[in-house]
């Protein structure tokens, strides 16, 4: 794979699609900043003291216009940053170009192959002979995964000289990961151990990545502290819910121009993401059916006037299918064969294994017709009818549209900045062990408060008597940790 790192005139490394788009990217970044009051407030409050000075931060998170504002917030607080995207389709090339030119090392472009994707991840983690990053901003956990798998392989190699075997797995993506680690072992057999020793911690953006972290914590495999940003209320109840409510119909309409009103839409999963997706489809005039494993979530869907059925009940009747579960094997090729002609199948969960893309790609005689980038019609030979799959089963709202709007991402990314500050400020205190943590309630409330003024809100303030009566401090926090919102 002949990929070469390029350098700006100032010597900063990068690999993006088209640097001539940098001016366009800068214009959109300036527009987004106005919609991201939380990040702007972080620069105002913390910028003068440069609290991240000396910190090396690697980011593996969708390289969008909104992420560009996050990156420039981190650099404004003193950090040095290297960045890659966490999805092969989610990069906005003009955003990548602007940041690569002006602010940070970026390795990302829309439409990467899996081989290119992991090359970019490796580059973002590569800080030269001095080891890796001090901090990671992760989304989905791929940067964290690469380090953990690298350390594991190095330990085996040190013990008996055995290299990782890419053929030991059927997963084509993990084969690439093992190949990268194998190649690295031949150059520096302690590469990932050096990264582990330097790392202060990671802050994780999304549900899927958080699941990985908790799994590693349970088995004692977690190598460094982690802050679970996803379960901050101002992330999961805003980005996951309202962001998806905005971006699902946006992606559907950009990709297909289909009229949603009157259609039958199946939302697989009714967590925060599923709730946002179902609300969007209902508002657009679709008849919404939810599939769920959890009786509580199922009952919530029913209380919203939605039907709750199994996929098998509705697979031949629905027009639009969207997976939101964070699980695997939700819509299989046998389901797709039974769907209406030109039924739309898409995913808004982090990875591409909710939809059985491998089964679809290897189905005997199936024909793939690319309508436009990230919009494909797959025709089955035995029925001569087809389905439309968006973004190859990956995140359709970023593959087919531009993801969540700036304002709601400001909530999520302000949490990320606070998490990075917390990890860096406490790096020598012993406060954070090799465990997964959630930001405290008062910081969650602070993130929300930073966004109220932009929307013209004015908070009511407790009197001292009221505060004493309900045993809630006048300045908060206002809810107990277990409050569900």
Curated annotation (Swiss-Prot):
Enzyme Commission number(s): 3.13.2.1
Protein known as: Adenosylhomocysteinase 2
Gene Ontology MF terms in the entry: adenosylhomocysteinase activity; mRNA binding
Protein role: Adenosylhomocysteine is a competitive inhibitor of S-adenosyl-L-methionine-dependent methyl transferase reactions; therefore adenosylhomocysteinase may play a key role in the control of methylations via regulation of the intracellular concentration of adenosylhomocysteine.
Keyword Transmembrane helix belongs to the record: no
Cofactors demanded by this protein: NAD(+)
Species this chain originates from: Arabidopsis thaliana (Mouse-ear cress)
Enzyme class, UniProt record, top EC level: hydrolase
GO terms for biological process, alphabetical: one-carbon metabolic process
A Pfam family reported for this protein in Swiss-Prot or TrEMBL: AdoHcyase
Note: In contrast to SAHH1, a mutation in the C-terminus of this protein is not sufficient to abolish transcriptional gene silencing.
Disulphide bonds in the chain: none
Keywords: Hydrolase, NAD, One-carbon metabolism
GO CC annotations on file: cytosol; vacuole
SUPFAM superfamilies: Formate/glycerate dehydrogenase catalytic domain-like, NAD(P)-binding Rossmann-fold domains
Residues binding substrate, per UniProt: 64, 139, 205, 235, 239
Keyword Nucleotidyltransferase annotated: no
Catalytic activity from the UniProt record: S-adenosyl-L-homocysteine + H2O = L-homocysteine + adenosine
Residues that coordinate or bind NAD(+): 206-208, 240, 269-274, 292, 327, 348-350, 397
Alphabetical list of SMART domains matching this protein: AdoHcyase, AdoHcyase_NAD
Family listed: Belongs to the adenosylhomocysteinase family.
Domain of life: Eukaryota
Pathway: Amino-acid biosynthesis; L-homocysteine biosynthesis; L-homocysteine from S-adenosyl-L-homocysteine: step 1/1
């Amino acid at each position: 794979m002949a990929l070469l790192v390029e350098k700006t005139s100032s010597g900063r490394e990068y690999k993006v699609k088209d640097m001539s788009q940098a001016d366009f990217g800068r214009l959109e970044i300036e527009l987004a900043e106005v919609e991201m009051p939380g990040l702007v407030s972080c620069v105002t409050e913390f910028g003068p003291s440069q609290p991240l000075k000396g910190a090396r931060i690697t980011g593996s998170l969708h390289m969008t216009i909104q992420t560009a504002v996050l990156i420039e917030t981190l650099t404004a607080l003193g950090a040095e940053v290297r960045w890659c995207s966490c999805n092969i389709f989610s990069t906005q090339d003009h955003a990548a170009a602007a940041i690569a030119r002006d602010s940070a090392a970026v390795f990302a472009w829309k439409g990467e192959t899996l081989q290119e994707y992991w090359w970019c991840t490796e580059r973002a983690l590569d800080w030269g002979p001095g080891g890796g990053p001090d901090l990671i901003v992760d989304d989905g956990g791929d940067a964290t995964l690469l380090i953990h798998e690298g350390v594991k392989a190095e330990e085996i190699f040190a013990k008996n000289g055995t290299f990782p075997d890419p053929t030991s797995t059927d997963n084509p993506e993990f084969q690439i990961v093992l190949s990268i680690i194998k190649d690295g072992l031949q150059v520096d057999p302690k590469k990932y151990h050096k990264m582990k020793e330097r790392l202060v911690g990671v802050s994780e953006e999304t549900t899927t990545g958080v699941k990985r972290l908790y799994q590693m914590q349970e088995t004692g495999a977690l190598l460094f502290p982690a802050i679970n940003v996803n379960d901050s209320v101002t992330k999961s109840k805003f980005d996951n819910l309202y962001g998806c409510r905005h971006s699902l119909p946006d992606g559907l309409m950009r990709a297909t121009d289909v009229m949603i009103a009157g259609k039958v839409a199946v939302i697989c999963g009714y967590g925060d993401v599923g709730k946002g997706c179902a609300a969007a489809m209902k508002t657009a005039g679709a008849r919404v059916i939810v599939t769920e494993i959890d009786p509580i979530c199922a009952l919530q869907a029913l209380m919203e006037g939605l039907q709750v059925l199994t996929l098998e009940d509705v697979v031949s009747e629905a027009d639009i299918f969207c997976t939101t579960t964070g699980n695997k094997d939700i819509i299989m090729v046998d389901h797709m064969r039974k769907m209406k002609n030109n039924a739309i199948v898409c995913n808004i969960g982090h990875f591409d294994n909710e939809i059985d893309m491998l089964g679809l790609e290897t189905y005997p005689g199936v024909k793939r017709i690319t309508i436009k980038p990230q919009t494909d019609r797959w025709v089955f030979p035995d029925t001569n009818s087809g389905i439309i799959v968006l973004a190859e089963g990956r995140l359709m709202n970023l593959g087919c549209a531009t993801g969540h709007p700036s304002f709601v991402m400001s909530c999520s990314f302000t949490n990320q900045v606070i998490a990075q500050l917390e990890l860096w400020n406490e790096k020598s205190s012993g406060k954070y062990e090799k465990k997964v943590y959630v930001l405290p309630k008062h910081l969650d409330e602070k993130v929300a408060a930073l966004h109220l003024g932009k929307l013209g809100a004015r908070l009511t303030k407790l009197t001292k008597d009221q505060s004493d009566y309900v045993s809630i401090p006048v300045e908060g926090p206002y809810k107990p940790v277990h409050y569900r919102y």
